[in-house]
Amino acid sequence: MIRKVKKEIRVIGFDDGTFKFKARGDKVILVGVVMKGSLDVIGVVTRWITIDGLDVTDAIIDAVTSSRFKDLRVILLKGITYAGFNIVDVERVYKETGLPIIVVIRKKPDITSMELALKKHFNDYEMRIRLLKSAGTPIELIPGKLYYQAIGISREKAEEVIRITSRNALIPEALRLAHMIASAVMTGESTRE
């Protein structure tokens, strides 16, 4: 439980790399950037996850629990779908790491369209839809520009964490850097957040 959000709060932000869809089963890098507030990068963790697979939850749990970074206070996710429709089980990550999760989203997700795509392309669509819905309804923080979902943390504290960990962009710096690093690994060059 976070009593007070300090300026130097330790967070880890996860994002995957840009990828060209070739075939289900290919791998994409997942990068976690560990930061103290919005200024100091403390470290980086990586895992490989499967396009349209079901391994991102295990990858995040392993990256957090097996790392040397034992003073983390919050996990930041850039959405809950990675490598296509590899969907994070946010409730399981919260339970197994003991850390609150803040999912940050730039565009409000169209859940109906996502459900239709899942039904069309996946035999296990019911389970994937359940995972999508388990994060709750996105809350609008900056009208039309930034939304979030909070698991294991109050709305007020989640918004404070987002503000404190953001620097020159709308999203927390750990997420911005994770995106740049992951994209550079996958394509040879970083892409814009």
Swiss-Prot record:
Coiled coil (UniProt feature): none
Disulphide bonds in the chain: none
InterPro entries on file: Endo_dU
Gene3D superfamilies: archaeoglobus fulgidus dsm 4304 superfamily
Membership in a protein family: Belongs to the UPF0215 family.
Protein name listed in UniProt: UPF0215 protein PYRAB00790
Organism: Pyrococcus abyssi (strain GE5 / Orsay)
